[in-house]
Amino acid sequence: MDWILICKALILGVVEGLTEFLPVSSTGHLIVAGSFLNFNDSHAKTFDVVIQFGAILAVCWEYRQRIVSVVSGLPSRPDAQRFTLNVVIATIPAIALGLLFEKKIKAVLFSPVPVAFALVVGGAIILWAEARQRERSEPPRVMSVDALTPLDALKVGIAQCFALVPGMSRSGSTIIGGMLFGLDRRVATEFSFFLAIPIIFGATLYETVKDWQAFTVDSLGLFALGLVAAFVSAFVCVRWLLRYVATHDFTVFAWYRIAFGLFVLLVGYSGWLNWA
């Protein structure tokens, strides 16, 4: 196996794991990093989905007791049924729009410059949302994931649709959207984690069936390396983020998004790099 390809797979796996659950857009970072590393062949998008699967496995492991409890309680426990219903409701809008506009989005927006614009716009939205949070005098309306109503779930699901634009961030859209709709910061973060499970599992299955030719003997090793790197880095990131949101807001991520987006634009328009 080519050592350069191994290094690229590991780098992209770590990038995915560190950015999947932060409000900075993992897809945007993978597009920029893949272009910079010249890792953007016909199977690159399949590789990206595979390593996203590695990141979601980290969430499944972190919340394994909760997931087992919900699954085992589905036949008889109302709280498990309500939680599952909320996840399904919140997942439907993004899946529906994604299936309708997938080809157009990938053709028009899956390149570094559109991603950079989305990073900057998303950063500005986070700054605005955090300013609104500071102006609020009343406490959040929803203080537990189990207290979410189907309407709350639908609102978060609609917010998740913004993440179809690469660079906007799925976690950023759901967490910030949830906070604006009255969810406590930690509740919005945890619900965002759970929403990622069906979305990314579905995307992995879809891409696997659609591009099964990519899973050759040579590519399986690279996919496995990227998946493991994404799993480990995502596991560390999830645990860190849960501690972080207990005492901090997302302003630092907003400024990072804006700075990174402007840097990508500067590099592209200055001719220093020819973004693919």
UniProtKB/Swiss-Prot annotation:
Membrane topology type: Multi-pass membrane protein
Domain of life: Bacteria
Major localization listed first in the record, in broad terms: membrane
A Pfam family recorded for this sequence: BacA
GO biological process per UniProt: cell wall organization; peptidoglycan biosynthetic process; regulation of cell shape; response to antibiotic
Any GO MF annotation of the entry: undecaprenyl-diphosphatase activity
Enzyme class, broadest EC rank: hydrolase
Transmembrane annotation, as ranges: 83-103, 108-128, 187-207, 217-237, 252-272
Keywords, sorted A to Z: Antibiotic resistance, Cell inner membrane, Cell membrane, Cell shape, Cell wall biogenesis/degradation, Hydrolase, Membrane, Peptidoglycan synthesis, Transmembrane, Transmembrane helix
Subcellular location: Cell inner membrane
Coiled-coil residue windows: none
Entry GO terms, CC: plasma membrane
Record field: catalytic activity: di-trans,octa-cis-undecaprenyl diphosphate + H2O = di-trans,octa-cis-undecaprenyl phosphate + phosphate + H(+)
EC numbers: 3.6.1.27
Function recorded in the entry: Catalyzes the dephosphorylation of undecaprenyl diphosphate (UPP). Confers resistance to bacitracin.
Further facts: Bacitracin is thought to be involved in the inhibition of peptidoglycan synthesis by sequestering undecaprenyl diphosphate, thereby reducing the pool of lipid carrier available.
Family membership: Belongs to the UppP family.
Name of the protein: Undecaprenyl-diphosphatase 1
Species assigned in the record: Burkholderia cenocepacia (strain HI2424)
